From Swiss-Prot:
Its EC number is 4.1.1.48. It comes from the Bacteria. Coiled coil: none annotated. It catalyses: 1-(2-carboxyphenylamino)-1-deoxy-D-ribulose 5-phosphate + H(+) = (1S,2R)-1-C-(indol-3-yl)glycerol 3-phosphate + CO2 + H2O. SUPFAM superfamilies: Ribulose-phoshate binding barrel. The gene is trpC. It comes from Cupriavidus necator (strain ATCC 17699 / DSM 428 / KCTC 22496 / NCIMB 10442 / H16 / Stanier 337) (Ralstonia eutropha). The keyword Isomerase does not apply. This is Indole-3-glycerol phosphate synthase.
Amino acid sequence: MSDILQKILAVKADEVAAARKKRDLPSLRAEAESLRTEPGLAPRGFERALREKIAAGQAGVIAEVKKASPSKGVLREHFVPEAIAESYASHGAACLSVLTDVNFFQGHADYLKRARGACPLPALRKDFMVDLYQVYEARTWGADCILLIVAALDPGLMAELEACALELGMDVLVEVHGDDELDAALRLKTPLLGVNNRNLRTFEVSLDNTLDLLPHMPADKLVVTESGILGQADVKRMRDANVHAFLVGEAFMRAPDPGVELARLFA
């Protein structure tokens, strides 16, 4: 595990401990479970939204609402989650990915609530999930999907987090960085398999990461390529390899209008 990832996970454990002191788990769980059928807050179907786009011959784009990153610093000074989400929705995005990590990505729970509330798209809580508390928390914030990072979790905990999310009606995107993590990911029930093209140790990005893993992917998995999609040539390279789901952040966040850039990139 990389030093930066270890540092992030230590902070996450502290965050969960602090959150539990403010609100106990039974109370949080009860609220999360009550939202299964709540108008406007019930899960919107993250996987379904991706598959519908792909079935229509389009790319399934998970468009990121991200202010900053540890490696690149602030990506977007004028950061208005509602406006970004509306722009994505009107320019063909399938889903949103909203950073909720405060300390490393300058994200916030409110960004998720505001972005999802401004458009009809399902939203991923993009964060480092290490505890069941965060899964219930994600649902109360409106998340339709959570991210599970194989490099950050032991298999038992990962399965427990997935089961909790599925029970609440959410989808799960499991993320791998290399073939050494694939076996653990494939033991989960979720069909959503993300491949992060960014090396968590060096922060270098290579689209070969996705392409190298493709031969090892079962046919029933929906592969999402993450990081490093910066131009139309990158999109073409992936789609030529039969990868049609993308998680893109930086390219959109640096553009004057994120949604317009999405439409241009995936034209």
